């Protein structure tokens, strides 16, 4: 199992714990640890799904917020555990970040893809990666790929969690 380099994970990202808690609450999962989950899902299915979201986001960027980089942004997907039923535990890394996110149930698969791909579409902010612009892009992706009602509901719950997602919000949230 690959180790997680926590050197890029900032303690100043006050939104991080709240966002992960919001994700699990909104998608109906259960928190075992704040950032680690496991999912039995076909590796090929997950790869295809994540690549579809990522490609769609790059072709029609959300508010033209594409991370500017000389290298092509990528979503690194690792096969960690292959089971006899051809499912596996999947781990995803956003480009230039070392946060590892895994999900506990198949219905959380969409959340994992949306969450990580949103990191690839917004400018890097390693000190506070879950700042207002990321939340805005995340909500737009949810509106496109899940539905307007879901996006509105998500942002309403985000307000209850005191997560700032508007332009006048500070990166520390």
Predicted regions: what they are:
Residues 4-108, 124-173:
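Metalloprotease/metallohydrolase-associated module, dominated by Zn2+-dependent proteases
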Residues 111-124:
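Active-site recognition of the HExxH zinc-binding catalytic motif
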């Amino acid at each position: 199992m690959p180790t997680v380099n926590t050197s890029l994970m900032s303690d100043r990202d006050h939104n991080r714990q709240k966002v992960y808690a919001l994700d699990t609450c909104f998608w109906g999962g259960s928190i075992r640890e704040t950032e680690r989950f496991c999912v039995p899902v076909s590796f090929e299915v997950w790869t295809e799904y994540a690549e579809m979201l990522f490609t769609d986001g790059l072709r029609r960027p959300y508010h033209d917020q594409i991370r500017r980089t000389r290298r092509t942004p990528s979503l690194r997907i690792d096969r960690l555990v292959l089971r006899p039923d051809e499912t596996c535990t999947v781990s995803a890394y956003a480009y230039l970040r070392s946060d590892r996110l895994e999900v506990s149930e198949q219905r959380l698969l969409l959340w994992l893809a949306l969450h990580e791909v949103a990191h690839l579409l917004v400018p890097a902010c390693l000190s506070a990666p879950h700042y207002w612009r990321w939340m805005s892009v995340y909500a737009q992706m949810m509106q496109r790929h899940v539905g307007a009602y879901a996006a509105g509901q998500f942002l309403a719950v985000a307000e209850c969690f005191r997560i700032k997602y508007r332009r006048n919000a500070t990166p520390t949230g």
